[in-house]
């Protein structure tokens, strides 16, 4: 049996109602054809000229906007008054008659215009009536029951266990048994293969507080029963068949409870319970694994096994008359290839926006009230207008700018480029250059045409008197740093300078800081004392001792007479510090091969054999070798003592002798002639030579570090000085001490 076409009650009234609306429709502003309104003067076309109101809506133009207060960007210049059942800015929205799923056992189609309700139910096999609510006698009466307590389902929090888990004895309801008939097709849905999705909350799809749900959707061919095979951990408690809206909202308000049949290992939904198209079920399962009552949301899409041949698509009811039904031999289902602008599994939805008729990125709104290709509305972006938003709005067409301003139109409105001297959104106000008090710091503003000038207060400058005069720019401080202070300046003088401009230098010498007749020399921030030679110090307060830094050695003394100290060396030393011992042997004072031994402030000569004297200048004649040998072998210090003693005795005797001789000679000289004088002279000469010899002997005895010696005196022949050829000293020989 083919699906029947059910006509909704009152469908035949639709043409009459449409005609009545056309005949009774009022003209603009309440005018009618019998009383035409006098023709208005020709002007620019209004916003209602494009007939933007759809579905019999009445367009009313808004008052012309004030140029000073233009309408908000994007707001149209008209409003639509929609008839009953129609809504939207352009009366483009019509309530979907199929949204409430009026067809209980069939598919709802809004394509027919012969129904006053705006929809047509295509009943499934076994059902009839305007809403497919009447079951044929072949439907088992035990398959449906009334909804006992329709209620809004509430999610179970994930952290909270249900108040009571029904035991299996109470959860399992005694159901009529079912046995498959010969050739009957059954599709099994295994419960353990259905995954629990935690984010699916029954009652609130965005909630995360539910214990989870099971969402299943699959297709089955027509005339096929569905067997829900349960496992050992879950048992089905309740099952409702709901509308599409109730399925989305997890609501049982418009649902009916379903009593499936009991089969081996599961529950069975008979094919008579599954209408052609979408079938939505909500069930509750007592799950012992999750220890909660899990919601099962089941969608079964039933399709006919084969396509119904027809002369045109209008008779192809499987695809709502707006598509081509196709099937494959390997599949038990069919699919619809929809015509242009039709969408949905059964091509049941008309989408006028599918071909994107709106231009300039406008939004297309599908009205869904008729299928003539014009049931859409374009919502234009700011700056565009027209049925398809194809025209750009010229906001400058009414010349809103005044006083010769230039109007610039943009997508969001217009802007006015004002000439000099005017301002405002439409350049309607004249500029007062001094109105904004541009002169700062108590400056006085004067209007100069469209400009202004400022007379600045003392200390300020600039076009708006905003700048302090920089008094320091001219560097008024001669020897200091300039600092601006308010409307003046101040000089911070460098050390050593004073005055208003730091032009005067301090004379530090006025206080006479230098002592001891020193000269004071004035400096910048200071002074310098030039001391006399014998003074030193910052103020020449210290006496400079010439000997303070002089080091005199070896018993020398420092002479501080003068500016520089001088060392006066002890005998035998030389040098600036008397640190050099004079080597008297450098002049080779020892004669006849004598060896010179340097001594402090002197020297000693070690004479060779046969020579004596300080410088080994006296030659000795020895009487015998024994005496010489004894002198040679005698210790030198003993010899020196003996010789010294002999010499002293000899000298005393010699002095006495000489004195006596000289006295005698003087007496004789006084009474004698010249020869006597010459003789006396020769005597003095002899006495002088002899005295030198004795002195040399004494020097050898009493010289520096000389060794003691004793001498025996013997006569020595002095032929030149002795008149009687008799030697005065015959022999000088050493004695052992």
UniProtKB/Swiss-Prot annotation:
Coiled-coil intervals, chain numbering: none
What positions are modified (Phosphotyrosine)? 711, 721
Domain (EGF-like): residue spans on this chain: 44-92, 94-133, 309-348, 349-390, 392-428, 430-466, 468-503, 505-541, 543-579, 581-617
* Region of interest (Interaction with AP1G1 and somatodendritic targeting), ranges: 677-680
**Topology term for the membrane:** Single-pass type I membrane protein
Q: Which residues lie toward the Cytoplasmic compartment?
A: 662-737
Q: Which SMART domains match?
A: EGF (SM00181), EGF_CA (SM00179)
- The identity of this protein, by name, is Delta and Notch-like epidermal growth factor-related receptor
């Amino acid at each position: 049996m083919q699906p029947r076409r059910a006509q909704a009650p009152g469908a035949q009234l639709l043409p009459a109602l449409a005609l009545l609306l056309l005949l009774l429709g009022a003209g603009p502003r309440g005018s009618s054809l019998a009383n035409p309104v006098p023709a208005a003067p020709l002007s620019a076309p209004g916003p209602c000229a494009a007939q933007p109101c759809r579905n019999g809506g009445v367009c009313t133009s808004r008052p012309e906007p004030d140029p000073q207060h233009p309408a908000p960007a994007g707001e149209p210049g008209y409003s639509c008054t929609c008839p009953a059942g129609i809504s939207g800015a352009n009366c483009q929205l019509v309530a979907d008659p199929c949204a409430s799923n009026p067809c209980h056992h069939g598919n709802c189609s809004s394509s027919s215009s012969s129904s006053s309700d705006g929809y047509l139910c295509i009943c499934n096999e076994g059902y009839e009536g305007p809403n497919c609510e009447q079951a044929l006698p072949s439907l088992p009466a035990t398959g449906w029951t009334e909804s006992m307590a329709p209620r809004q389902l509430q999610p179970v929090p994930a952290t909270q266990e249900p108040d009571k888990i029904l035991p299996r004895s109470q959860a399992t309801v005694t159901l009529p048994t079912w046995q498959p008939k010969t050739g009957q097709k059954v599709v099994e849905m295994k419960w353990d293969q259905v995954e629990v999705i935690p984010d699916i909350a029954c009652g609130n799809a965005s909630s995360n507080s539910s214990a989870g749900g099971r969402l299943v959707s699959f297709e089955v061919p027509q005339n096929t029963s569905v067997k829900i095979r349960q496992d050992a951990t879950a048992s089905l408690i309740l099952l409702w068949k709901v509308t599409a809206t109730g399925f989305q909202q997890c609501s049982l308000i418009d649902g009916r409870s379903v009593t499936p049949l009991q089969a081996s290992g599961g529950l069975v939904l008979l094919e008579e319970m599954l209408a052609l198209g979408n079938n939505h079920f909500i069930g509750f399962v007592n799950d012992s694994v999750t220890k909660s009552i899990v919601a099962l949301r089941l969608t079964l899409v039933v399709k006919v096994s084969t396509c119904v041949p027809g002369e045109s698509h209008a008779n192809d009811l499987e695809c709502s008359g707006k598509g081509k039904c196709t099937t494959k031999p390997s599949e038990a289902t069919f699919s619809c290839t929809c015509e242009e602008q039709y969408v949905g599994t059964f091509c049941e939805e008309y989408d006028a926006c599918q071909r994107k008729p709106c231009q300039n990125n406008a939004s297309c709104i599908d009205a869904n009230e008729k299928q003539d290709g014009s049931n859409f509305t374009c919502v234009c972006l700011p700056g565009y207008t027209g049925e398809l938003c194809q025209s750009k709005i010229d906001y400058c067409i009414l010349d809103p700018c005044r006083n010769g301003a230039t109007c610039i139109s943009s997508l969001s409105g217009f802007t006015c480029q004002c000439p000099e001297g005017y301002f405002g959104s439409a350049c309607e106000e004249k500029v007062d250059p001094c109105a904004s008090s541009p002169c700062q710091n108590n400056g006085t503003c004067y209007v100069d045409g469209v400009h202004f000038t400022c007379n600045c207060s003392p200390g300020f400058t600039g076009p708006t008197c905003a700048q302090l005069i920089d008094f320091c720019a001219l560097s008024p401080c001669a020897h200091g740093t300039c600092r601006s202070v308010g409307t003046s300046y101040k000089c911070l003088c460098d050390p050593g300078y004073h005055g208003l401009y730091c032009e005067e230098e301090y004379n530090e010498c006025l206080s006479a800081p230098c002592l001891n007749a020193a000269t004071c020399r004035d400096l910048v921030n200071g002074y310098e004392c030039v001391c006399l030679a014998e003074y030193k110090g910052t103020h020449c307060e210290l006496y400079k001792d010439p000997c303070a830094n002089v080091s005199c050695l070896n018993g020398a003394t420092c002479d501080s007479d003068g500016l520089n100290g001088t060392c006066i060396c002890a005998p035998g030393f030389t040098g600036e510090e008397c640190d050099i011992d004079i080597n008297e042997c450098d002049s080779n004072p020892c004669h006849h091969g004598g060896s010179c031994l340097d001594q402090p402030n002197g020297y000693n000569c070690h004479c060779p054999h046969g020579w004596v004297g300080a410088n080994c200048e006296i030659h000795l004649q020895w009487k015998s070798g024994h005496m010489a040998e004894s002198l040679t072998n005698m210790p030198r210090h003993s010899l020196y003592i003996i010789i010294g003693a002999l010499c002293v005795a000899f000298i005393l005797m010699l002095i006495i002798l000489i004195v006596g001789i000289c006295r005698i000679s003087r007496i004789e000289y006084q009474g004698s002639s010249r020869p006597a004088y010459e003789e006396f002279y020769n005597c003095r000469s002899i006495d002088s030579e002899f005295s030198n010899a004795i002195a040399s002997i004494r020097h050898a005895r009493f010289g520096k570090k000389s060794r003691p010696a004793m001498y025996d005196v013997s006569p020595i022949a002095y032929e030149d000085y002795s008149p009687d050829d008799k030697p005065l000293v015959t022999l000088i020989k050493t004695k052992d001490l």
